[in-house]
Amino acid sequence: MADWRPLMVRRDDGFPRIMGVLNITPDSFYADSRLSSIEETLKIATTMVENGADWLDVGGESTRPGAKAVDSDEEIKRILPIISALRNKFPDVGISIDTRRAIVAEAALDEGADMVNDISALSDPKMVELIKTRDCPICIMHMRGLPENMQHNPEYGDVVSEVKKILSQKVNILISAGVKPERIIGDPGIGFGKLLEHNIKLLSAGKKIIPLEKMGLMWGVSRKSMFSDLLGRKKTEDRLAGSLGIAAMAKSRAVDIIRVHDVAEHRDLFRAMSTLEDF
């Protein structure tokens, strides 16, 4: 396993760690990110690592709006050989497993994954005990509803305070079980049961949604449908500029990890911004 501790917080220059997305699914919302073989995944992952990825996030179930769930056996079948191959090739790179199921997370951790990226924020009651026992980090994300129905007219009074309240409840469950705050990272869940106005408010709030000082903040905005509403970009392949525009805010919002499809472009952005700050 990698030494994930320094990878949970921002870089020394204040910019976030970069997490590259590896979708081992046939139906993820961004077609170019769909991977189906170990060889293809290793090729893409190698490019990501060479371009500066700190983390590789492996998912075997699509969570795009309207996506149907797959069973745990199929999810494990998809991700296990990939994680094994990634761990062998990249011993020092952080590997996270994107799953809602404790049984899948456990199998991934056994194979060498370092962190659990749980978009359902502990919907599986066995997840808490797993995280406590393994003493591994976890990302908990806010989502209103399920992927198949989350975008059906989501409503909030004050989206920032409501998201923080839910995350606080989940964090308290973990803390009560003995999980250390620095093992926990929160994600506002951009595009998961939110309209454009909700997404913008949450991005603007930055780390204000995080209930504990020692916790981290992760953003996942890469090529999401909010750029269709914001910029009129209906095709996912046309949303890179919008993704980079949001990423440029990450340092000022104290983001620790940013989850992206386009590692090289985000690393170049942060390098350019860091260089300009020195003048």
Question: What residue spans do the PLM features occupy?
Answer:
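Short glycine-rich or small-residue beta-strand-to-loop segments that form or flank ligand, phosphate
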Residues: 189-191
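Glycine-rich, aromatic-flanked loop segments that form ligand/cofactor-binding clefts
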Residues: 16-19
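Enzymes and membrane/adaptor proteins characterized by extended Gly/Ser/Thr/Asp/Glu-rich
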Residues: 26-28
